[in-house]
């Protein structure tokens, strides 16, 4: 197994069954709700928090799928077999169903759970089929949360951290298309167009903020390539990011700087470098080969990838519990495999 992927898998194995330290996002309705992470979340109790545990499991699946028969295959399979069981998922579903938890992990953790589901659905392997069947009840719960949330979301959430809506819409859309959930696909496409079709002059020069791990501008552009026909997307991108260079330069977008990698908030900027890189590649992939912006998009992506992957070293758990998932999404080109835009039947569109 090549570097750095072996390092990433090792980092996932080091955290998916590591209960502490742990930051729980938990509403207590009574004394009985004061429980340990493993009691609250029988499957996703590791990796410091619920969403990181979910994408840690996704990372193991992704690396098993893209790099089979590596030295860590047995350990990764055993960890997934232990955690992704019907019994454990029943506990996760019960947690979601309890009073006061309608907004639990919305939307970031929900998006990663659907990404895990999409990965398992795509992989033609007996292990994937076993794990996919196990998480199916939680998949249904989470996709239903999207359905109840999006009609009531009046405005996009344009921030660079967990609550950002563009990232969650993109991953949710990828799952809906893979799962054949036309209702959710239509809802996400309609909401994305309503939020963003008229957006202009995104202020990317103001990015990043001091604790970002997602670029508001680039994640929106990465979403919209999924929901617009190619010609429409070209015109939209011209207006949305009009200053992308056409000379092949990379210096138009400078990577984020982390001065203290032991600070759980400040280390977010290592993540923004990784997620910027995959978004830049996604935007470039949506442009025709002759588009002169492609070179500058890919040059900036390469710089961000180099800086970002170097930061994924596991030296501190503040970044070690999650950065490898971002790096895996990037280096395995997961985003470039997103199901393509397609015209939806009119009867499927929300009124």
Model segments located where?
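HEAT/HEAT-like alpha-solenoid repeats
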Residues: 10-13, 17, 21, 42-46, ...
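Solvent-exposed loop and edge beta-strand segments that line ligand/cofactor-binding
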Residues: 1, 38-54, 94-110, 152-165, ...
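Active-site-adjacent bridging/hinge elements
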Residues: 26-35, 88-89, 141-147, 196, ...
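Terminal, non-catalytic domain-edge segments
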Residues: 1-15, 22, 66, 123-126, ...
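Extended ligand-binding groove/face enriched in aromatic
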Residues: 54, 63-176
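Loop-centered beta-sheet repeat module
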Residues: 145-220
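Low-complexity, Ser/Thr/Pro/Gly-enriched N-terminal "stalk/linker" regions
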Residues: 1-45
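Well-ordered alpha-helical segments within folded domains of soluble proteins
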Residues: 52-63, 106-121, 163-177, 212-226, ...
């Amino acid at each position: 197994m090549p570097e750095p992927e072996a390092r990433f898998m090792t980092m996932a194995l080091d955290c998916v069954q590591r209960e502490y330290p742990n930051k729980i996002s938990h509403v207590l309705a009574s004394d009985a709700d004061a429980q340990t992470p493993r009691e609250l979340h029988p499957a996703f109790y590791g990796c410091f928090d619920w969403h990181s545990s979910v994408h840690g499991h996704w990372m193991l699946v992704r690396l098993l799928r893209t790099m089979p028969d590596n030295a860590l295959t047995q350990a990764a399979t055993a960890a997934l077999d232990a955690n992704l069981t019907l019994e454990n998922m029943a506990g996760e579903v019960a947690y979601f169903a309890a009073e006061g938890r309608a907004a639990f992990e919305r939307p970031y953790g929900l998006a990663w759970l659907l990404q895990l589901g999409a990965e398992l659905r795509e992989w033609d392997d007996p292990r994937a089929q076993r794990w996919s069947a196990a998480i199916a009840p939680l998949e249904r719960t989470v996709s239903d949360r999207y359905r109840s949330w999006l009609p009531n979301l009046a405005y996009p959430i344009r921030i660079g951290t967990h609550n950002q809506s563009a990232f969650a819409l993109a991953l949710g859309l990828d799952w809906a298309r893979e799962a054949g959930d036309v209702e959710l696909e239509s809802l996400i496409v309609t909401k994305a167009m309503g939020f963003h079709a008229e957006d202009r002059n995104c202020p990317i020069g103001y990015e990043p903020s001091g604790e970002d791990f997602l670029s508001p501008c680039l994640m929106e552009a990465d979403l919209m390539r999924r929901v617009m026909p190619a010609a429409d997307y070209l015109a939209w991108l011209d207006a949305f990011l009009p200053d992308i260079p056409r000379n092949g330069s990379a210096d138009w977008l400078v990577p984020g700087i982390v001065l203290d990698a032991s600070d759980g908030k400040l280390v977010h900027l290592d993540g923004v470098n990784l997620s910027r890189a995959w978004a830049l590649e996604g935007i470039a992939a949506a442009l025709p080969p002759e588009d002169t912006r492609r070179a500058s998009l890919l040059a900036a992506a390469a710089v961000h990838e180099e800086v970002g992957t170097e930061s994924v070293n596991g030296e501190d758990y503040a970044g070690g519990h999650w950065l490898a998932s971002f790096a895996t999404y990037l280096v395995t080109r997961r985003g470039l495999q997103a199901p393509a835009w397609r015209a939806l039947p009119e009867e499927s569109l929300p009124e």
